[in-house]
């Protein structure tokens, strides 16, 4: 099945502590059904120093994966979250916004 949300897409968070925030998808974890969104769902990780690799220890913030059902593609023309469909144009399968019918970049 084709992915409705792909890397580099701009998405809006639908649920959770970051509801309403927008960000760019940095990674899609297809087998787990999760996405990593830049600057969203940040968690603190306590990291031990690794002198052999020259890494300092401390507390770092990093993005945690969130379920793909908790984000929606952001339609900048409409200014809101939108659903995505697929259609065939010129022999290629393309994504389009269901509310406006225009193609996703």
From Swiss-Prot:
Disulfide bond sites: none
Gene: rplX
Biological source species: Aeromonas salmonicida (strain A449)
Name this polypeptide is given: Large ribosomal subunit protein uL24
Biological role stated in the UniProt entry: One of two assembly initiator proteins, it binds directly to the 5'-end of the 23S rRNA, where it nucleates assembly of the 50S subunit.
A Pfam family this chain is assigned to: ribosomal_L24
HAMAP family: Ribosomal_uL24_B
InterPro entries, A to Z: KOW (IPR005824), Rib_uL2_dom2 (IPR014722), Ribosomal_uL24 (IPR003256), Ribosomal_uL24_CS (IPR005825), Ribosomal_uL24_KOW (IPR041988), Translation_prot_SH3-like_sf (IPR008991)
Gene3D superfamilies xref list: 2.30.30.30
UniProt KW keywords: Ribonucleoprotein, Ribosomal protein, RNA-binding, rRNA-binding
Family from the record: Belongs to the universal ribosomal protein uL24 family.
GO cellular component, one term: ribonucleoprotein complex
NCBIfam families: rplX_bact (TIGR01079)
CDD domains per the UniProt record, alphabetical: KOW_RPL26
